[in-house]
Amino acid sequence: MSASLRLSDLPQCFQGVVPSIIATADAAGIPNVTYLSQVYYVDERHVALSCQFFNKTRRNLDDNPRACVEIYDPMTLQSYRLRLKFLRSEKSGALFDAMSARIDAIASVTGMKGVFKLIAADVFEVQRLEKVEGFLAAGLPDAEADRPSLGGHRTEVRGLQWVSERINRAPDLESLLVAALEALEEYFQFAYTSVLLYDEQADRLITLASRGYGETGIGAEVAIGDGVIGTAARDRQVLRFSTLDADLGYARAIRRHASSEHTCEDIPRPGLTDAKSALVIPLTVGRRLVGVLAAEDRDPMRFSEWHEAYLQIVGNQIALGIDRMLDRSAADLDADAPPSTPRVSPPRSSRKKLTLTYYKNDEAIFVDGVYLIRNIPARILWKLLEESKRTGRTEFTNREVRLDTALGLPPVKDNFESRLILLRHRLQEKCPDLQIVSTGRGRFSLQTCADIEMIER
């Protein structure tokens, strides 16, 4: 290997923006050249290649362990050649899991689950690394010089401190999520981000906050193991893509449409249909999944190794903050707080009329025939409406709602605050005449400026 050139100097070559090429030969010396799905940096002396099919390349390596791989810098289009010696195939372990998660995510989005999968991670010794001289015409601009500088270690530490403080000072869960995404945009210039929290009871991720996509998408669900986000959550693996092509954009844009008037349609998840890069960080406390932090961009080179490492630190802060908020909301529900100013209702003659229908079998609520919300948040809203209709009450506490066994909340880590955030956002978006307003820690009111007809089916 060249003494002046190291694999760690070429991180952009391992992002897969420009497909790499491998050349092998069989025992008789007959060559075979093909494209590679993944070239994975292991360390200064080793790389791993994805083995997805028992093809000619695989058979050649069994006969002859020597291979040559060309990788490309997507910014300069400079080519580098790796002379390799095959060492072993790994079918389990950390390396296999990291490479497999990336392939599984693409397979899930493109409908290729069970077909497009990793068979093994083939580990090679890099015996020589060389720059392919004369590959490009002289005089091309230096792309490295044009890359923005982040100001060195002092700026990095100061930025991390700033983001951490924003998260730590948040008074409640919703403020924490908003502050985290705002800080990521202000410091990192991450313009398109979202946070999804894990609902253990439903085994799904629920979108609770987003930035850059407008006001829609809160409440959108992702099944564990589904797509890039669901795969990152299932495997507890960070996923970074620089090659999100048209297939991913097309798959994300497809929505299941309601087949009848009262079918609970999916809420479209916030996302760019033309995203070229993505970085997905599972939010965990130990090995326990709390949620997922997702960022994407139209620039295929937006996210680097540096961003991945740095965002993992930020993700740990967010995960601990979420966990702290959920613990606190379970233990400290009825702290005294000044009441909010009540909303003044308009005269009865001018009030709107709303029809809310609760479908018990689907556990879903519709407003004037339009889907609003389902599952536990729907049960919570229906309980509040029934209680308000029966007693005239509009003020409630988290504690009393949580203690209602009919709601089916889990006894530990019930995510009540996150469910209330989701319900509040869905009402703001779909039913602004009916609102849930915080009146202090552990307290809220049900406010309406419409006459509500309740129908249960």
Indicate residue ranges for each PLM-predicted region.
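Signal-transmission linkers at sensory-effector interfaces
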Residues: 138-174
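Helix-loop-beta substructure at the N-terminus of cytosolic sensory domains
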Residues: 170-208, 325
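Regulatory loop-to-helix N-cap segments in sensory/regulatory domains
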Residues: 216, 273, 290, 296-313, ...
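A short, aliphatic-rich beta-strand micro-motif
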Residues: 266-268, 276-284
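DNA-binding patch around the recognition helix
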Residues: 332, 372, 387-389, 409, ...
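Short amphipathic alpha-helical recognition elements used for nucleic-acid or partner binding
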Residues: 370-404, 423
